[in-house]
Amino acid sequence: MMSVRTDLLLAVLRDTLAATVNFIMLSTANQEVYDPAELHLGDSALVVDRAAHQIFQANLLAHPGTAKLDIVATVVGEEHPYLPDGIRDGQLLVLLDPADGSNQWRCQRAGWCTAGIVVQRTGDGWRFVTAFSAAPDGRLFLLREDGAVLIGSTHNAIMAPFRGPTPPNPTKEHIVAANAYKHASRHLTAPVFDALGDDWFCLTFAGNPAVMNLLTYDTDAVFNPNPSSVWDTAAVMIAAHTSAIVGSIDGEIWTPQQLDELFGSRVELDPATCQFVPPYVAAKNEQLYREVVSAIKAGLASGS
């Protein structure tokens, strides 16, 4: 195993993420003032995705710390699913989702984040190094190589290991977020919402932004009934290193080591095969995880 200057890598990622998030937040499209009830489905999510990818890559390569790290010059991921030739043993590769939740951004300029993972080339395979996620409100999550989760802000360099439990939900109802904003997913999530009952408040967005809310806000659980790409589950990999519970929709709880081996060390960019991460549930504790898993099983059995 080749060593990585992890602290330097995380510092470079923090600065690069700050520049990317600020670019999106300060863009002309983001600054336009809309009626809160008005949806803007004509605004292309691809525009912000592609621009953010270019900004991330440009700032990563321009960072003075990058010269001290052996990083592949091409950032790959959702907006550039092409692995460059000539990657050497020991080099670092960034897999990026530049604006995860771009459909939320398109509709309301909220509910998105910039996220991804970093892997290292090792012979014919890859080794997971870190995962990262940054939200427009400045929240920044980074995973240190020793498994400690660093939570801080993109606006300053202060980062602290996350050691306590995820914050409790102060409201009467539990809150669950599910990947159901697309029509194709609604038939999978609607029966689950029904099975959870009136004690649960259901939100129809998921992915990295929702898992970030699980760790720092009042969201109790997140589930995605669909397979996803590894850059879509960066925050899930981070959550597994905290007191949160992450597992399959069948009730199998995944350890951080399992996630690293099964998902974090695999590089698959072909759009036809890159969604190899199975459906998942993340929750603040095991009781909530089991409750959502039971609702998923009941919902699937209902045949709705």
Go through the PLM ranges and name each one.
Residues D43-A51, R106-Q108, F205, S229-T233:
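Short, conserved micro-motifs enriched in small and acidic residues
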Residues M1-A99, V293-S304:
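N-terminal subdomain of lithium-sensitive/metallo-dependent phosphomonoesterases centered on the IMPase/IPPase/PAP
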Residues E78-H80, D97-A99, A135-D137, N179-A180, ...:
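Fold-independent oxyanion-binding glycine-rich loops
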Residues I87-L150:
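DPxDG-like acidic metal-binding loop motif
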Residues A148-V149, H155-M159:
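Short, surface-exposed beta-strand-loop junctions and turns on beta-sheet-rich folds
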Residues L17, E145-G147, F162-S304:
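An extended, acidic
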Residues D70-V75, L83-D89, R121-G125, A135-R139, ...:
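Exposed regions on extracellular, virion, or secretory-pathway luminal proteins
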Residues V72, G125-T130, D198-D199:
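A broad structural signal for short, well-ordered beta-strand segments within beta-sheet-rich domains
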